Amino acid sequence: MKKTLLLLFTLLLALSAQSQNSLRLMTYNIKNANGMDDVCDFQRIADVINHIHPEVVALQELDSMTHRSGQKYVLGEIAGRTQMHAYFAPAIDYDGGKYGIGLLTKEIPVSLKTMTLPGREEARALIM
């Protein structure tokens, strides 16, 4: 796990080395795109991200093409509203689609890899 985190950190540093001295990272559990009011609102999620101005956003609890999200590619919806590049890593099949994690980046990464993580409970994914 430490090697994986080191690799991810190195990737993020490479992104920032192009033109900046700092890198703004954000992690966001979007709870299947449903807010505290149980309303699915992609623009509201994008507004939060746009307000922070991150170079990289790691998203958790992300639906893709599920019935509960209106069979939409949620990460693509958010990416379009934030002008960021989207990378999805499915962890499980769910509700007619996939459920997993995502990464949004301002710059196109040199290389990305997804993998499933071992465990006894619900399957997990990792983007490196």
How does the language model describe each region?
Residues 23-30, 45-69, 104:
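Active-site beta-strand/loop signature of hydrolases that rely on acidic residues for catalysis
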Residues 17-40:
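N-terminal active-site segment of His-dependent metallophosphoesterases
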Residues 1-22:
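Bacterial Sec-dependent N-terminal signal peptides
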Residues 12-15, 25, 56, 84:
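N-terminal cationic amphipathic segment used for targeting or macromolecule association
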Residues 40, 44-51, 73, 77:
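Extracytoplasmic/secreted proteins, especially bacterial periplasmic and envelope-associated proteins
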Residues 2-3, 24, 31, 124:
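Basic side chains
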Residues 22, 37-38, 62-128:
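Structured beta-strand-rich core segments of catalytic domains in phosphoester-bond hydrolases
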